[in-house]
UniProtKB/Swiss-Prot annotation:
UniProt keyword rRNA-binding, yes or no: no
Lineage: Eukaryota, Cryptophyceae, Pyrenomonadales, Geminigeraceae, Guillardia
Protein name: Large ribosomal subunit protein bL33c
Family: Belongs to the bacterial ribosomal protein bL33 family.
Organism listed in the record: Guillardia theta
Subcellular location: Plastid, Chloroplast
GO molecular function, one term: structural constituent of ribosome
NCBIfam families, A to Z: PRK00504.1 (NF001764), PRK00595.1 (NF001860), rpmG_bact (TIGR01023)
HAMAP family documented for this protein: Ribosomal_bL33 (MF_00294)
Amino acid sequence: MAKGKGVRIVVTLECKTDQGVYRYHTTKNRRNTPNRIELKKYCPLTQQHEIFKEIK
């Protein structure tokens, strides 16, 4: 029997400064964070920490 949708989903984070160039993949709990997340991660293109925003 198949179960329903899980609580955790895989999301893609994209750099706001270099859009479409570098992305991270991570999971989030859809109950705790229903809105789009923004995380500060390392961008190897700019060689510094940048804000990465969740995309569809």
